[in-house]
């Protein structure tokens, strides 16, 4: 399997995840803006990889598999960081717990959809769970919202 530009962009998105985590916890005033820049750069690779793959005829089963995995890794990690940012561990029933509940629902949905896609693929019905325009729109809104939420004034 040759390593194509779209696949390299997807792998770059995955590689940016630990960078995002490290920068998030840096005790510098610029780290909040750097987190947003890293997250936006990763989101841009999500837009670019598919567009490049389709326009250059470099689509592959591996790329089609890896792209949503990379999205889920990136979004799930960012949600966990947001829960860490907005949670107060001394108050179990504080309003901040809403962030943890929302993150759990979103991550649970992502895992469920991935499992459903895998199962449908195994039984030969993968066309029933292909990525739709609504799913792409959800990803755009989700990544935009997370990008805004990652920015914090210290």
Predicted regions and their residues:
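A feature for the membrane-embedded catalytic helix bundles of lipid/isoprenoid biosynthetic enzymes
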Residues: 2-10, 14-16, 21-22, 34-40, ...
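Aspartate-rich (DDxxD/NDxxD/DxxxD) Mg2+/diphosphate-binding motifs
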Residues: 60
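Membrane-helix interface residues
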Residues: 3, 56-57
């Amino acid at each position: 399997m040759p390593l194509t530009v779209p696949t390299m962009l997807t792998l770059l998105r995955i590689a940016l995840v630990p960078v995002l985590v490290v920068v998030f916890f840096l005790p510098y005033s610029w780290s909040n803006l750097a987190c947003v820049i890293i997250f936006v750069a990763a989101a841009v690779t999500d837009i670019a990889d598919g567009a490049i793959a389709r326009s250059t005829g470099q689509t592959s089963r591996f790329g089609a598999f890896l792209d949503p995995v990379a999205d889920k890794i990136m979004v799930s990690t960012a949600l966990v960081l947001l829960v860490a940012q907005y949670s107060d561990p001394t108050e179990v029933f504080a309003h901040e717990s809403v962030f943890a509940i929302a993150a759990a629902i979103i991550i649970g949905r992502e895992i469920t959809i991935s499992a459903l896609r895998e199962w449908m693929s195994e039984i030969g019905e993968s066309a029933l769970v292909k990525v739709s325009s609504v799913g792409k729109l959800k990803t755009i809104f989700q990544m935009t919202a997370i990008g805004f939420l990652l920015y914090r004034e210290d």
